[in-house]
């Protein structure tokens, strides 16, 4: 609770007088921050499923400390990646003449069986009369190795039907040995030039069956690995501000993440029925992102938002707009974003129900 955190940090005396804020002028600033985040990460790890994953956004000030803490809590072997996110365009009036425009999204898994993925470009499979009901694709049969590196793969392939010869390139040998070629030929896994009119190939290629691809890939079939370079269309902090201003009619929250950023992270790491927990909910961007992603892919993800009822400054736009604490901002955003998404779906002929529950 907020009270427990204040007690741990020694922020009040016995008469409940505030002693200090945890600002960067506090000599124990980093230690206090580390103590606060450590306890929350321990709880987060306990709540993760075995194939679960956590994303944590941080700026330069604590990125190094956060990585060390996460290595201890989740294990260094479960570090997935760091995604640099550009939060703003460069500013000129900055210390040392360097504009710090990025935050860093650290990703850790509960266990090593997690794998991020995105929908990949669909592979081209062919259906031919000679293999009815067995779609197949082709793959290069060469490898980036020289004849001296792989002498067993430096040989001439001969088409048993036509006698046509295909010598290996000394700078790029075959990916298989001569014995393996014979085995693959018997298994119908070698495709030669001229076998199919629709294939424009100049040398033998390898045939892969779609059924084998599906068996090997399992749930990840049709998907590819993701890059730490985030997509260009996920937005910056100013886009997050526009979103919440358009929804609530006021700049009710400072520096909110754009929903597109959170939606992308959820899309690469979750299944359609997963739970998504955000225990620094703020303006409830995560809830907005979950609802939007569900609307787009037909998923049934549920979200849990956790936020202390921190009071809004009376001089802030949020307070003037009627929001007394941050929780009220988040609840109203969830309501309005949910109704907007619902209206958009119904305009497209989709009938959905909107349900809101609050636990106290």
Each model region followed by its residue ranges:
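Class I S-adenosyl-L-methionine
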Residues: 1-275, 297, 308-314
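Beta-strand segments within the central parallel beta-sheet cores of soluble alpha/beta enzyme folds
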Residues: 81-84, 281, 302-305
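A glycine-rich phosphate-binding loop feature that marks nucleotide/adenosyl-phosphate handling sites
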Residues: 123, 198-206, 281-284, 350-359
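A phosphate-binding catalytic loop at a beta-strand-loop-alpha-helix junction
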Residues: 274-293
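PRPP-dependent phosphoribosyltransferase catalytic core
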Residues: 292-360
């Amino acid at each position: 609770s907020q009270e427990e955190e204040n007690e741990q940090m020694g922020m009040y005396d016995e008469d409940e007088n505030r002693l200090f804020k945890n600002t960067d002028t506090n000599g124990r600033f980093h230690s206090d921050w580390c103590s606060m985040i450590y306890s929350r990460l321990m709880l987060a790890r306990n709540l993760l499923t075995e194939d679960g994953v956590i994303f944590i956004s941080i700026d330069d000030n604590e990125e190094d400390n956060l990585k060390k803490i996460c290595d201890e809590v989740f294990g260094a072997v479960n570090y997935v990646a760091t995604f640099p996110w550009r939060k703003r365009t460069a500013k000129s009036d900055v210390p040392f003449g360097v504009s710090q425009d990025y935050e860093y999204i650290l990703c850790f898994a509960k266990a090593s069986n997690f794998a991020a993925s995105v929908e990949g470009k669909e592979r081209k499979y062919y259906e031919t009369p000679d293999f009815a009901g067995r779609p197949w694709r082709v793959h290069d049969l060469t490898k980036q190795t020289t004849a001296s590196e792989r002498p067993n793969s430096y040989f001439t392939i001969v088409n048993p039907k036509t006698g046509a010869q295909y010598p290996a390139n000394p700078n790029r040998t075959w990916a298989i040995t001569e014995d393996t070629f014979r085995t693959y030929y018997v298994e119908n896994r070698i495709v030669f030039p001229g076998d199919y009119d629709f294939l424009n190939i100049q040398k033998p290629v390898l045939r892969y069956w779609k059924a084998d691809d599906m068996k090997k890939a399992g749930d990840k079939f049709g998907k590819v690995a993701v890059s730490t370079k985030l997509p260009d269309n996920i937005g910056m902090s100013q886009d997050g501000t526009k979103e919440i201003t358009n929804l609530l009619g006021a700049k009710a929250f400072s520096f909110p993440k754009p929903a597109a950023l959170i939606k992308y992270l959820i899309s690469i790491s979750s299944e359609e029925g997963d739970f998504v927990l955000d225990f620094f909910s703020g303006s409830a961007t995560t809830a907005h992102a979950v609802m939007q992603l569900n609307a787009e892919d037909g998923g049934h993800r549920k979200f849990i938002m956790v936020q202390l009822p921190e009071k809004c400054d009376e001089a802030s736009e949020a307070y003037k707009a009627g929001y007394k604490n941050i929780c009220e901002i988040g609840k109203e955003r969830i309501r309005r974003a949910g109704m907007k998404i619902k209206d958009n779906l119904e305009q497209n002929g989709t009938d959905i129900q909107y349900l809101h529950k609050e636990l106290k």
